[in-house]
A protein has these predicted regions:
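A short, surface-exposed loop/turn module that caps and links secondary-structure elements
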Residues: 30-55
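Enriched for short, Lys/Arg-rich terminal
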Residues: 1-12, 16-23, 27, 53-61, ...
Length: 84
């Protein structure tokens, strides 16, 4: 199981979200860290950004990188703003 680390910007965004959304995001990342190969995770690589992946959680997008040992969350944003 990979360790999940959050950037300062990601933590700030997480603290501003409603508690139920925060819980969903954390649960989804725990599921991803436990079984990254599962198709239920709905993870895709972003085009144009080397090594950056996105995880869908409802209307929210979580952008992150992974090296097998550590999953580093870069950004958490609403669907429309996540790719700017």
């Amino acid at each position: 199981m990979a360790a999940v680390l959050y950037s300062k910007a990601a933590l700030k965004a997480l603290l501003r979200l409603p508690p139920d959304v925060t819980r969903k995001i954390r649960l989804k990342f725990e599921q991803y860290a436990a079984a990254p190969e599962s198709l239920a995770n709905n993870v895709k690589a972003l085009r144009g950004e080397q090594g950056v992946l996105r995880l869908r959680v409802g209307d929210w997008r979580v952008l992150f990188t992974e090296d097998g040992i550590v999953v580093a969350v870069i950004r958490i944003a609403p669907r429309g703003d996540a790719y700017d």
